[in-house]
Each structure stands twice: as structure tokens, then as C-alpha cells.
């Protein structure tokens, strides 16, 4: 829970500076940048922190494709876009998942229709953003990135690539 409190505090002041934008331009092509910048600035900041942390972790390992690692770190949450969740909405969804996981999964919906449509959609995106982002990347022709993004919240397996393992670790630290 301490990590979630820190994430909330970071989100309150989330912004990107020119160095961050240059980093994104260095690693992502135009279409990929479109997906990155379609995210809320809070998610952009999180993705950048995840990428920077992943690079630090990679320096302690051998055989890591650091360019690919940075790319998947920057793109891992592109299934969430501006308007899906406000900061307070994210807090509410995290709390619902923590304390009422069966209820929140059962009521998650792609549709925004109905009295609670916004919240049902927010829950859906929370639970399925890896698959949503993976499909967006696949449509851009980024099949290798799509396959890793799809799995970044899945349970670890013995066959997971080093890059996927490092992404999960960096994501959990940010």
C-alpha cells in the first residue's frame, strides 16, 4: 500500500520535461509516440519512470536487449488513454480491486452506457489495458512489443524473457 501512496503523490505533480520528450523520441517511432502521448500525463510519467528504472536494472544483467526493454516500458500501458480514468478514478478502481475484487471484475464493462457506465468502463480498462494496448501495438506492426505488453500483468512463467521480467520488476517499483 505504501507504493500506491507514493504513486498517488507522484501523480499529483506529474509532468514531462524536454529531456523526457527527447527520450521518447529516441526510442519510439511516430505511430508509437502517438500511442504514448494518447495516455494521460500521469501514465506517461509512470511509463518513463518504468523505462528509466528498467534501464538501471538491465545494467546489472547480461544479454538484455536494452532498446527493446525501453520500448516495452514506454508502451506497456498504452491500453489506457486520456479520459478512461481520472486520478481519483484510478484511486477508486485500485481500492475496489483491493477490497471488492470479485464485485469489481463482475461489473467491469467495455461499454460506458448506463448510470455507472464510466465506472464500469474504468474497471474494464484497469483489468484489460494490457490486452487493449497489445492489440493497438499489433495493429501498428509492433508484434514483438505487443506479445510482451500482453503478458506484463500475467503470472510469471519459466519461459518469460529477461526483458519481460525486468519490465514487471520496474513496473512494480513505479
For each predicted feature, which ranges?
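Non-catalytic interface/linker regions that flank or bridge core catalytic/transmembrane domains
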Residues: 1-35, 155-156, 174
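Divalent metal-dependent catalytic cores for phosphoryl transfer on phosphate-bearing substrates
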Residues: 33-174
Amino acid at each position: 500500500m505504501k507504493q500506491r501512496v507514493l504513486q498517488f503523490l507522484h501523480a499529483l505533480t506529474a509532468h514531462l520535461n524536454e529531456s523526457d520528450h527527447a527520450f521518447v523520441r529516441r526510442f519510439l517511432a511516430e505511430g508509437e509516440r502517438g500511442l504514448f502521448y494518447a495516455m494521460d500525463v500521469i501514465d506517461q510519467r509512470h511509463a518513463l519512470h518504468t523505462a528509466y528504472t528498467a534501464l538501471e536494472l538491465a545494467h546489472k544483467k547480461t544479454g538484455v536487449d536494452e532498446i527493446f526493454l525501453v520500448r516495452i516500458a514506454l508502451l506497456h500501458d498504452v491500453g489506457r488513454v486520456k479520459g478512461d480514468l481520472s486520478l481519483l478514478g484510478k484511486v477508486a478502481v485500485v481500492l475496489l480491486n483491493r477490497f471488492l475484487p470479485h464485485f469489481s471484475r463482475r461489473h467491469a464493462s467495455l461499454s460506458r452506457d448506463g448510470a455507472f457506465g464510466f465506472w464500469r468502463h474504468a474497471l474494464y480498462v484497469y483489468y484489460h489495458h494490457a490486452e487493449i494496448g497489445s492489440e493497438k501495438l499489433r495493429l501498428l506492426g509492433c508484434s514483438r512489443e505487443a506479445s510482451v505488453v500482453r503478458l506484463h500483468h500475467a503470472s510469471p512463467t519459466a519461459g518469460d524473457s529477461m526483458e519481460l521480467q525486468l519490465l514487471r520488476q520496474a513496473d512494480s517499483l513505479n
